[in-house]
Amino acid sequence: YGMSVDYGYRSGLFSFRGETATGSSHAWATINTMSYRLASNFTMRLVQRYYSYKYYSLFSQSYSDGGRVQNESGVYVGADWKPFGGLLLSYYADAAYFPWARYQASTASRSFDNLFSAVYTTGRLTLTGRYRLKKRQKDNADKTALIYKTDQRARLAALYDGGSWSIKAQIDGTTTVFKERSNGYMASLGGGTTAIRRFAIYATCGYFHTDDYYSSIYSYERGMLYDFSFPSYYGEGIRYALIVKYMPTKRLYVMAKAGTTDYFDRSQVGTALQQVDASSLTDIQLQLRWKF
């Protein structure tokens, strides 16, 4: 069995809400959020969470650093500030503690996450800058002690929305320190148009180069209707994809996607039963929707 209670309070510029749950595991999980608007252009948030290592619920979903509503407690602090016009500055810091062993950590461990972003919009142009620093304890090579894995990721992006068409340029960089230091970057360009009657076309292309798997680059990619993905890239290569939407009638919707990843540093992709004896991978998707 499982049961939970939701609660909340709001007064003026202050709001509080939360949820506490338990069940047949006889353990507790709770998350509580507070926000306060200090000024018309400045808001702060505080999130406290505690998920017992014994707690279990089949359909539980909540904010967490470890990806599960279990074996975690932590505090999140964030703020949004609009100093002027189209500029939005955001920052958050999150500290988490995992009292029991987890993947790649054979004893209690900790993690720290910080992110700063700036978004400036003027007319049809949007400029974005982001920096993230994350530290997480993991087992050393001999599994005799925990050491920190430190990830630093930065992004610069420019988006121009021309109404019936748009174009976006983006540069990602990463530095990872875990046993050794590794670096990586990716430069990508994407755009699309809806100017052609009944059609919508989107295309992306990106070049990536990383030292190894630890410095993998994650990049957003459009997918089918109601779908998207954040594939990871490591090594050296190019990723390009094309998406075409066709709406011949109000009831029929056709969408196709073709994408290819060409690697310059290997002659095989994947391992074991998923190994491909080639330096490239191609994925093709087709979706049809009919409204009754």
Predicted regions span which residues?
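Exposed, low-structure sequence patches enriched in small/polar residues
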Residues: 1-292
